[in-house]
């Protein structure tokens, strides 16, 4: 016997309509391209989203058509989120740090008909426009007067386009299974793969993260995680639904600019990758400043080191919350929130707990399996391939012939993890980053975190490279705080207090910078390729 409840599709137009009625005065703060800080409301942004929907309709955009963006976290990009998906088209956010060849591949694979870009990215698009097979119109997200001379074909000003349109627009009735957005994976091996989200998955994820992260209507949230990466972790959608203040940092992600926004808007929650927070902490420490309003810093993309967790707590009274997920998961899967258990622990034990990736949100199931696909015990010791399933987790890559899940519906994340008896999940490493040496495993993440507890180490990266006897051995790359090299023996002696001897790196290489992707993740594949003969030559 079925229940007698109403059927009601979970769609982005429903979220927009809700915000128009109840969250219209919610604040949207945005740093614009000229550096100015703009304040508007969700009500005003929705009016402009309706204008955009009207304009796109006149440009021939219909249900399911793809509209791409290459843009920073700003007010126009926010309007695009809802104008595109709200009309039933597919919002395709593009990572501007893809190589030109990858951009061409992705735009052609997605068959984007319209491309909306910030003026910053005009040179990037000029270099590839002749290779784009489907893009008919390029919209530059600025006033016409501020757009530099360029050679783009069939281009127009975003503001001029909207100026001609009416704010009257009737959002369509969509099935919740209609596609809403498209995001491509990082593509470190082979071509990037497309992940096509639905309205249902997007809304369910947005509702869930608000409760899990503790967002309230009185919150002020600053996502440094880019809007071109997995929908900025779903925060823009959650903001519209819940009405909290959304603070968008634009292109200025330096410590001074972020601190200015935090202070001016009394931001209480920050979201981003560890490399961004490393720069912010350095700036604040150098200036002797404290973030008075921030109480939570959500970290994802890569593991936050113990030293960062400690610094946010001791210097800013802010709790660093680890989250974990991936593009295929919309992205959030687990989160290590401020539970009563965590807050009751002695400080040092709490910091250690905070280094873990946390507990699955409702809607996400996790398990680890061995090489025979047998589920491993949740004992905090056994580690194996991490698999997931849930309503906002991908089943099949965009345009792929075969599902990406196994026969039981589980998706293999490519991570190696351990699950503790209380359900807390800890990433041991990416499967491709685990160092296999003499039949044993070394976690590059654990070795990096051990190095980062040294008082003069700013950033660390560990990769496995071929070894003539042991298959692979670790190389440790370091950036020091003072820019000077440290005696390698000192580093090894320091590490030996934290790891077993056979984990010690075969070489330590001091560098001025490490390669990062657009989302802040270390590009270990670049280092592995560059140094693949390093130990073979010794």
Over which residues does each language-model region extend?
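Conserved AMP-binding/adenylate-forming core of the ANL superfamily
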Residues: 28-74, 78-82, 99-104, 157-160
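Structural core segment of the AMP-binding/adenylate-forming
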Residues: 15-17, 58-59, 86-160, 482-484, ...
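Conserved beta-loop-beta connector loops within the AMP-binding
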Residues: 360-387, 421-422, 484-488, 523
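AMP-binding/adenylate-forming catalytic core of the ANL superfamily
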Residues: 98, 115-117, 390, 396, ...
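Gly/Ser/Thr-rich phosphate-binding loop
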Residues: 267-272, 282-352, 365, 372, ...
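Conserved pre-ATP/AMP-binding loop-to-beta segment of ANL
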Residues: 9, 24-26, 139-140, 155-156, ...
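Conserved AMP-binding/adenylation subdomain of ANL enzymes
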Residues: 203-220, 228-269, 283-284
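Conserved AMP-binding A3 loop
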Residues: 39-43, 180-204
């Amino acid at each position: 016997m079925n229940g007698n409840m109403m059927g009601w599709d979970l769609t982005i137009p429903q979220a927009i309509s809700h915000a128009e009625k109840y969250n219209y005065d919610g604040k949207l703060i945005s740093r614009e391209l000229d550096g100015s800080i703009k304040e508007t409301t969700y009500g005003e942004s929705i009016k402009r989203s309706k204008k955009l929907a009207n304009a796109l309709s006149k440009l021939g955009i219909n249900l399911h058509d793809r509209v791409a963006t290459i843009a920073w976290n700003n007010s126009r990009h926010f309007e695009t989120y809802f104008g595109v998906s709200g009309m039933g088209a597919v919002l395709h956010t593009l990572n501007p740090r893809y190589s030109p060849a990858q951009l061409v591949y992705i735009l052609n694979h997605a068959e984007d008909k319209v491309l909306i870009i910030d003026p910053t990215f005009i040179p990037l698009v000029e270099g590839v426009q002749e290779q784009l097979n489907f893009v008919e119109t390029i919209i530059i997200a600025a006033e016409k007067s501020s757009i530099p001379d360029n050679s783009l074909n069939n281009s127009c000003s975003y503001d001029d386009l909207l100026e001609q349109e009416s704010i009257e627009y009737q959002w369509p009735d969509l099935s919740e299974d209609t596609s809403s957005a498209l995001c491509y994976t990082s593509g470190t091996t082979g071509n990037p793969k497309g992940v096509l989200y639905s309205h249902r998955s997007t809304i369910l994820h947005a509702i869930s993260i608000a409760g899990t992260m503790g967002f309230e209507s009185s919150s002020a949230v600053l996502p440094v995680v880019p809007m071109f990466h997995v929908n900025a972790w779903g925060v823009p959608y959650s903001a519209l639904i819940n009405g909290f203040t959304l603070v968008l940092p634009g292109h200025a992600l330096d410590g001074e600019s972020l601190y200015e926004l935090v202070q001016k808007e009394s931001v209480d929650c920050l979201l981003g990758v560890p490399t961004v927070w490393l720069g912010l902490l350095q700036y604040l420490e150098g200036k002797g400043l404290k973030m008075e309003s921030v109480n939570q810093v959500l970290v994802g993309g890569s593991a936050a080191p113990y030293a960062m967790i400690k610094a946010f707590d001791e210097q800013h009274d802010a709790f660093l919350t680890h989250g974990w997920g991936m593009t295929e998961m919309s992205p959030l899967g687990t989160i290590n929130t401020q539970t009563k258990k965590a807050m009751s622990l002695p400080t040092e034990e709490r910091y250690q707990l905070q280094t873990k990736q946390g507990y699955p949100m409702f809607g996400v199931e996790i398990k680890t399996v061995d090489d025979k696909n047998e589920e491993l015990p949740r004992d905090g010791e056994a580690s194996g391939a991490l698999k997931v399933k849930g309503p906002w987790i991908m089943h099949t890559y965009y345009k792929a012939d075969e599902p990406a899940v196994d026969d039981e519906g589980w998706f293999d994340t490519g991570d190696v993890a351990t699950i503790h008896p209380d359900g807390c999940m800890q990433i041991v490493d990416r499967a491709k980053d685990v160092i296999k040496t003499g039949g044993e495993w070394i976690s590059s993440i654990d070795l990096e975190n051990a190095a980062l507890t040294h008082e003069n180490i700013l950033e660390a990266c560990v990769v496995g490279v071929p070894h003539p006897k042991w298959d692979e051995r670790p190389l440790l790359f370091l950036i020091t705080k003072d820019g000077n090299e440290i005696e390698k023996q000192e580093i090894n002696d320091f590490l030996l207090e934290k790891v077993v001897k056979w984990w010690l790196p075969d070489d330590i290489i001091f560098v001025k910078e490490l390669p990062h992707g657009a989302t802040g993740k270390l590009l270990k594949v670049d280092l592995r390729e560059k140094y693949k003969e390093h130990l073979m030559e010794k």
